[in-house]
């Protein structure tokens, strides 16, 4: 080969390499050589834009900041100059405790929703503490019309039969602050010697903190609370770190200077005062167990000890979200409803429609309780009635990617509680559609005919989370493509604990050197106002029975034949099923309209719960949550029975403001507007794996509302998410199988928003 030929070939090679480089660079972006950005997924599904929402659902929207401000201004003007900001109010002051939506009457709402009538007047319910009156009391005022109020109406006597005693009021944050001031500045210094010896006591107890219990006393009129003391661990839960000291504080007096310690409990023994405890310690009569301050490391911390790994799976919408959220309204191709948050009762949804037909007027959380046992006074007497604290009030910002899918839609909540101005809880709700990774239904046939058919199991979810002291409750409303609704709550957070001594293992398991995880039950109560093909419904119970039967074709033999039993439940007493008793496996509400096959159109209530035993009725506090006696109860719907509990039941359980058994008065439930009241819960015996805190796995309960002959066939038969192909068809072809198109339809990249957090001190905003 000549030198000239070699040079020509070399030049051609250089040109070829240059051309290849140009081709490669053509696929790169001009932003510094990085790979070209993939196509971003649409944020709105083009085929359903804009999505329509039933504007009639506005009656159920929680109050806006403007409405809350207008109500507060009206109350300030009309209640006089003596009104004090609740954030600073002492027991002897007048203050506005809360302002929230007054739900409209159902008849007025339906007249608007279904018959085009005027929208119900929007009103607010304000709870006022009148501590400065000659006879202190609590009053409930309805204020309206919004957004420009011109009247307020005292409904206390109308709703409760008389004035509400002042001692029933929930405890304000300021009252807790004054109790802590009393404990740490006035009382604990009296036992400083003991506390230095046992618990690394610092000036005014800066390394310690308190946790409240409830109820507060032993009879109506009491306001005496056991407070447990714990190590204050920065960045970690203090709940598993009791020091063994518990104080019974009498804080009934309107003047905090008159509050006293009634009793002291320390590491297994009772004392009359901290002074007596200190004197006996100095005399060598107290057997002190030294409790180390474990700090925030090791298994007590929620901070992982390992570095982050590969990113977990991420769900996204390749062709845009298939639902929309506008204010408090959610709609998809199948479902439409309005959602909200009761400041005390918690999450709720209204006007729930499937394929345009209402199946329920209201599904809402009513109450939650946690009932404890133990051998210390605080643990043995604790029964938290969470509505008094505020299931909505103590909702928390949802953490993107942990509490909800990262790409969920997040919605704020506005509230006015213990303040003179509205505040906002960022990301209080999330709404998302999720592929459950489980088919809704499927069948693969290899017999006679060869085919596959199935429906992708997707659900639409609305979620909120409440952190009530140590526990976090995750509340889910889940909407399935076959018309079923699933309602459930998951418990996580920290266990409550007590100092371990004596026969502590009768009341739980030891989870630390000096820590007893105390046994307890969780129960939640739900209101289910089903409107099955109309307002007039009937309650039916169905079950199974084995009946001895002569074999028809061989009479000398007998068989046990399985058959269905059916019973119409005609009264409230018949439809009240005690917890732990026999409950029909199928209980459903039905209309007098039939499906194509002649069966009454119905919705079944299927409860998934493993609740502990109810508190015996001999207990003097049991009347405060008598709904816990029942697995399920069906009653006539009445406007004067809006809720199964009251925020005033916690601090006077002996004479409860609302007693659920009053709802069960043996009235007829045949052909009436009915409400089903559902209890779901579980027993929790804490164990080592509850440290650092409790997991949701296995700690979830709730119920399903399932179509029962409501349709002529499964409505998901018409789902656009259906997959079907037969032998001989090309299952890899798009026109046969939509999943075969994913390589084309799902090759976009989701818009990943920057991580954000709603903050920790939102109540101080």
Curated annotation (Swiss-Prot):
Residues 28-765 are extracellular. Residues 1-6 are cytoplasmic. Gene3D superfamilies: 3.10.450.40, Copper amine oxidase, catalytic domain (2.70.98.20). One of its GO terms (cellular component) is plasma membrane. Disulfide bonds join 198-199, 404-430, 734-741. Its main location: membrane. PANTHER family: COPPER AMINE OXIDASE, MEMBRANE PRIMARY AMINE OXIDASE. This is Amine oxidase [copper-containing] 3. It comes from Mus musculus (Mouse). The lineage of its organism: Eukaryota, Metazoa, Chordata, Craniata, Vertebrata.
């Amino acid at each position: 080969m000549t030198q000239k030929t070699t040079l020509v070939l070399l030049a051609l090679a250089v040109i070829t390499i240059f051309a290849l480089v140009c081709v490669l660079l053509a696929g790169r972006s001009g932003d510094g050589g990085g790979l070209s950005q993939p196509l971003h997924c649409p944020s709105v599904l083009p085929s359903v834009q804009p999505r329509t929402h039933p504007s009639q659902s506005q009656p159920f929207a929680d109050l806006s900041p403007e409405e809350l401000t207008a109500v507060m201004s009206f109350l300030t003007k009309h209640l006089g100059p003596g009104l004090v900001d609740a954030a600073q109010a002492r027991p002897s002051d007048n203050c506005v405790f809360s302002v929230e939506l007054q739900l409209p009457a159902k008849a007025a709402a339906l007249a608007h929703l279904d018959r085009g009538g005027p929208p119900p007047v929007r009103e607010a319910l304000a709870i006022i503490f009148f501590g400065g009156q000659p006879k202190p009391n609590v009053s409930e005022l309805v204020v309206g019309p919004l957004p420009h109020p011109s009247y307020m109406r005292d409904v206390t006597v109308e709703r409760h039969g008389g004035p509400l005693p002042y001692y029933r009021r929930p405890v304000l944050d300021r009252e807790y602050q004054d109790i802590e001031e009393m404990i740490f500045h006035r009382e604990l210094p009296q036992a400083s010697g003991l506390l230095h010896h046992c618990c690394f006591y610092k000036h005014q107890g800066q390394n310690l903190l308190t946790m409240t219990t409830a109820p507060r006393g032993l009879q109506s009129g009491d306001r005496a609370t056991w407070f447990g003391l714990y190590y204050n661990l920065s960045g970690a839960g203090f709940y598993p770190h009791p020091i063994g000291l518990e104080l019974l504080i009498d804080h009934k007096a309107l003047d905090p200077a008159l509050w006293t310690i009634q009793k002291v409990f320390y590491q297994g023994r009772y004392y009359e005062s901290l002074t007596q405890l200190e004197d006996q310690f100095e005399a060598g009569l107290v057997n002190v167990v030294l409790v180390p301050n474990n700090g925030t490391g090791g298994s007590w911390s929620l901070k992982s000890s390992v570095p982050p790994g590969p990113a977990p799976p991420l769900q996204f919408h390749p062709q845009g979200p298939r639902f929309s959220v506008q204010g408090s309204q959610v709609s998809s191709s199948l479902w439409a409803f309005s959602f909200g948050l009761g400041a005390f009762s918690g999450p709720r949804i209204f006007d729930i429609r499937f394929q345009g037909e209402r199946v329920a007027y209201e599904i809402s959380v009513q109450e939650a309780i946690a009932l404890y046992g133990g051998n210390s006074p605080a643990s043995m007497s604790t029964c938290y009635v969470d509505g008094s604290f505020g299931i909505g009030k103590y909702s928390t910002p949802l953490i993107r990617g942990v509490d909800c899918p990262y790409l969920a839609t997040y919605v704020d909540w506005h509230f006015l509680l213990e303040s003179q101005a509205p505040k906002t809880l960022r990301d209080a709700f999330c709404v998302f559609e999720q592929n459950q990774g489980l088919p809704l239904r499927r069948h693969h046939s290899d017999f006679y005919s060869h085919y596959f058919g199935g429906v992708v199991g997707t659900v639409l979810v609305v979620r909120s989370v409440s952190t009530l002291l140590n526990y976090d409750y995750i509340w889910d409303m889940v909407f399935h493509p076959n018309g079923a609704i699933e309602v459930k709550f998951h418990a996580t957070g920290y266990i409550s604990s007590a100092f371990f001594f004596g026969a502590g293992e009768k009341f739980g398991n030891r989870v630390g050197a000096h820590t007893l995880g105390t046994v307890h039950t969780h129960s939640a109560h739900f209101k289910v106002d089903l409107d099955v093909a109309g307002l007039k419904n009937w309650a039916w119970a169905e079950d199974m029975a084995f009946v001895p039967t002569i074999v028809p074709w061989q009479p000398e033999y007998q068989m046990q034949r399985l058959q269905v039993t059916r019973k119409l439940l005609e009264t409230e007493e018949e439809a009240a099923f005690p917890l732990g008793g026999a409950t029909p496996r199928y209980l459903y509400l039905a209309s007098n309209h039939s499906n194509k096959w002649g069966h009454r159109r119905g919705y079944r209530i299927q409860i998934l719960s493993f609740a502990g035993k109810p508190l015996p009725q001999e207990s003097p506090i049991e009347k405060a949550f008598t709904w816990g006696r029942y697995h399920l109860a069906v009653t006539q719907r009445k406007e004067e029975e809006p809720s199964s509990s009251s925020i005033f039941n916690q601090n006077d359980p002996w004479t409860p403001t609302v007693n659920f058994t009053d709802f069960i008065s043996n009235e007829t439930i045949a052909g009436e507007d009915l409400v089903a009241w559902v209890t779901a819960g579980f027993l929790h015996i804490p164990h080592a794996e509850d440290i650092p805190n409790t997991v949701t796995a296995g700690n979830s309960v709730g119920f399903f509302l399932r179509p029962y002959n409501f349709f002529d066939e499964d409505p998901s038969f018409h789902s656009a998410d259906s997959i079907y192909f037969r032998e001989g068809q090309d299952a890899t072809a798009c026109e046969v199988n939509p999943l075969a198109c994913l390589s084309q339809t799902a090759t976009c990249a989701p818009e990943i928003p920057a991580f954000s957090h709603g903050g920790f001190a939102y109540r101080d905003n």
